[in-house]
């Protein structure tokens, strides 16, 4: 077998007949498979041992030679070689076809490769191949046209007219093979190149297509006649197995049936030819052979598929590769793995951040080999077999050994669907009783897991390297930040938030207010003995916390705080300031001075003058975690998170906050508000009946009235709410629920959508506390059901989007430190009208500058060129009033097949500069795809009558952008730079005309009457600026402007959709994806290069070709950038393995074979497919060529049989 790690690239070509013969170990002549009596393979049949090898290891068919010592001998009785049975997965056979047969991929694909090569239409080809017409191969001296078709009747007439043998015309694949042999590639190519100089329109398109195929044949060394088969390879029998079921029946792969049909028809044809049967019978048999081979290669591609029992179409060779169940996606890209298990998950509140609970029974099974090794090492058992028995019997001593074995041996936990890289993390196992895996509550958010019956899978990394990588790179305690936005992903939720919220509440006049304590212990003791309440404001000596960063003026004083806050601050990292107020100033600058007593001041007086602070909410906790991470990095942060979790759980348990129906408040003036709304609606309807308003106006007025009534109730609720009400506390702290849930419980449910999407005029006046009437309940059900179905559809849609994104960007890896480009991207805040979608500060963080940034007023250099912009620096730049900065960007990076470190900036998941080898493409795809499920599915109508354009938003808009489709509600853009001089309205055609006057020319644009204008008379506009509201068509923008403008536009559009839904995604992720959509150019004029006009190629390949020509003094080629949707871009990738495993497998492979394509294995997918280590992370060449230093030899235990086999494999 080939050693996977040795080769650099992989090529696919057409197989010549001699190549097929060289693969084959013999001809399959009979359709028989297995003898049903002896269950032995039949001679010369599809499972013949002589051809394919023995069915049992080291044993010939007749049993004369058994045992390994006869290795390599061919038995003189039965002719079977004595070898491993595994060769039946490798050895191929062949069938000598008695008539040539066309290969359906090349004849039927779109475009038909045979048709283009011969310049014949697919219809004509089909008639010839399936014996419906003759084709003239050589007219000789007759006036017939070469390649013209003749029907049976016309053929006979022409033979009578010109005489037998005066011209050559044939039928079937044989005729096509003759024509293909006669194609003179160099001459045809030269002719087409001449034609291209003058051709236009359809003719030109066809010529470019033909030239493409002919040039591919010419360059690859494939011969066109190889598209017609004279010999058919038979794949190894173990790849199309036959298995005996209970009850003596057999289950066989469909391929065997398909091969049997081919062999039967081929043998019958041979017999007919021997007997000199009449031509029509032979023709019919040849046609049937052709159809049998078609079905074997791609069943159902032409005509009706051949069916098996129960009219089920048989699975042909093409179906074995295609789709989710095909070879690529089922077996090569995702395999099942051993040393894995799955179970339901339960919460493990006592676990540390890096631990997970593994049930004993599961652990002993997963770590069995490790335990067995230890048993033998400790001499509890003499050999491995005895150790295995010991484990299986459940000997008492195995549990202690298991404890030792799992120490320091991380395991991986994975929850499906794995939407981003945080869906698989490593933990240190802790043995537990029971049968459920225990999961740390803080990692639930990353996994999107809850404990309502979710299951998770567990995997054991086996090798030392795998364990090291799991520990260093995948340990859950290391994954504090979310790779999509660099914000903490492990923020506490629910009980933890509620506990800390309750703990940090302040209350006036509670027991113990004004007490002064000398240190923390004293305060805790007073609280535990009931002298002071958690929420009472008390004094504490600052000197009892000497390690906090106090100002000098604050030391040696008494500070006013609450007992709860003393406990809360006790778990904080020591270098963080003492937190009194939930705001950033306290967190970053220190504790405010107003909480400290001056000498001789009365503490009660100070307390009375201080405002009551609000407690710490979920958002504040998130900020504290982010600040802790920024200062102390992962180790300290994960320890702090565990303390925060424990404190939260403890105090939410003590507080005992519960919800009962009595906790839902009653709004005193609800009846009045609703009464007023009823009167208003009545007035509106009267006005409508009098004809004072249109139906649309009436509808809008009524729905607005009810909306306002609901808002009035909500406002009243908020005004009258009691901060000590448990529901309010849960909502306010961010533990669970929001104001809209609250207002449905206590206010009114409000307006509902009808099944057609229109809002119903009848609102639901009741709330959940009062209960709904039957009719109201019925109105509610539609919304609830639609929510469920929407979610289900959205999940599938979002998953497919992620798959396409991953596919297009999987080969984008950080390849070098600095690409040395002199280009950059000018960035400013992204705005949508007046609203700021993304601030400049957010966009600057973690990027490298391209030019130095100067203070706009003083001219002082704030930061030099090519420097990393930190969070503080970004704030400083924005505060200085700088509005735009030129940064290094993925868009302008010059690295081939990837990005360099400087153009990418920091790795958002670690907060440090990105490492070489980071698979940033995959991370970008996951970061954009993972929040996809949070986006809405709807197409919104913009406010009633005002406009008739539907603006697509949410997931459909994201798909529209990434697939580069023409948007709905397209904006009109200007092609000239200049000034808007006039806007005319034309009532007769219901349009407006916009006139733009520029230096280079004038433009006149017709826009629909109803479109909202974005410009006014006198406005200056740039090329590509939108004149009306709506989305710009990116392909149109690319024609008018340059690549960078399109990239910037797409980036801003994606951010608008995500930010409007409250999802933050780092710019760099979108940049990586958009760059992949603009990697290709189309050659317009080849100049002196040997490129073909109209070819699509990679920008870097194009510049390379031009460099060579310019050096030798020739004319360079010109090209035009092409914008591709992500699906198209994935299929156009340089790697045929990656493209074939994505979509349209047969089309990709057909094309690659004709071109003799080489896959240089640069991306991740192609390496996974062939089983090579991926060239990212530790798999990169620069990290792999390190010589390991052996410290001490590892002893290997071998049993005699194993030893025997080892010797053999070495001898091989």
UniProtKB/Swiss-Prot annotation:
One of its GO terms (biological process) is DNA-templated transcription. NCBIfam families: rpoC_TIGR. The keyword Transferase applies. Zn(2+) 1 binds at residues 60, 62, 75, 78. Pfam families: RNA_pol_Rpb1_1, RNA_pol_Rpb1_2, RNA_pol_Rpb1_3, RNA_pol_Rpb1_4, RNA_pol_Rpb1_5. SMART domains: RPOLA_N (SM00663). It is an enzyme of class 2 (transferase). It catalyses: RNA(n) + a ribonucleoside 5'-triphosphate = RNA(n+1) + diphosphate. DNA-dependent RNA polymerase catalyzes the transcription of DNA into RNA using the four ribonucleoside triphosphates as substrates. SUPFAM superfamilies: beta and beta-prime subunits of DNA dependent RNA-polymerase. This is DNA-directed RNA polymerase subunit beta'. The keyword Nucleotidyltransferase applies. The RNAP catalytic core consists of 2 alpha, 1 beta, 1 beta' and 1 omega subunit. When a sigma factor is associated with the core the holoenzyme is formed, which can initiate transcription. Its cofactor is Mg(2+); Zn(2+). Mg(2+) binds at residues 450, 452, 454. Belongs to the RNA polymerase beta' chain family. One of its GO terms (molecular function) is magnesium ion binding. Zn(2+) 2 binds at residues 819, 893, 900, 903. Binds 1 Mg(2+) ion per subunit. It comes from the Bacteria.
